[in-house]
Amino acid sequence: MQSNRKVSFVIPVRVDSPERAQNLDLVVEQLMALKESIRMEIRILEADEHPHYELKISDEHIHKTFVRDASPVFHRTKYLNRLMQEAEGAIVGIWDTDVLLPKEQILEAVDAIRKGNAVMSFPYDGRFYMLPQEDSLLLKKREMNMEECCQKIYEYVLAHGPNSVGGAFLVNKNVYIKYGGENQHFYGWGPEDAERCKRMEILGLPIYRAQGPLLHLFHPRMQNSWFGNQRLEYANRMEFIRVAGMTRAQL
């Protein structure tokens, strides 16, 4: 960890709406601002029948890959494992395409892993706020900033209660991969966020949370933002139950 100070931010994407692409533009811009504070890279993998996302920033720190994938279901966990293997950093940040976080919170979460205080580290305290369409648009137009959003968070919907585990997290790459990485049995949208935390808990691996909220930009809820069908929903829920019932030795 000491010899490799780079942090890799990895983002799998399937563009299912104009808002999704616009949100990712803003997320990339925000992450690029971290260059002033840490050695970093951003790796984006787009998986779809045809490419729909075009980077707006040309920079040696950003790498984009396109994978042809005609499946209607976006196998996010599979692509995350590929991105983690390709990542150059000893710390990997796994980011959704639509989340914004204050810079200080991201750096706090990185520092917890660097100091050996965590294997998994969240850059927020569990409060996951859904921004309305109007404020999301103001942010993208630069007519509102993160600080102003954070000042009015109590006007926003707290999506998953006060202890969310989705949106963004960082891991010690080698340790996380050693203990399974992402669970590819989750196919499409499902409870993989809860599963990975439960797995860390069973294994006795430390998890850290930075203080402060996460902001989620508006986008339409399309197929890959919800369970694809009843069969997939059942299979994904049963996978979570299976893992949650395991012992450390079984994992």
Residue positions per predicted region:
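Short beta-strand-to-loop acidic/aromatic patch adjacent to the donor-nucleotide binding site
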Residues: 89-100
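C-terminal catalytic/acceptor-binding lobe
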Residues: 20-23, 163-164, 184-251
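Cell-envelope/extracellular polymer assembly enzymes that use nucleotide-activated donors
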Residues: 6-10, 41, 195
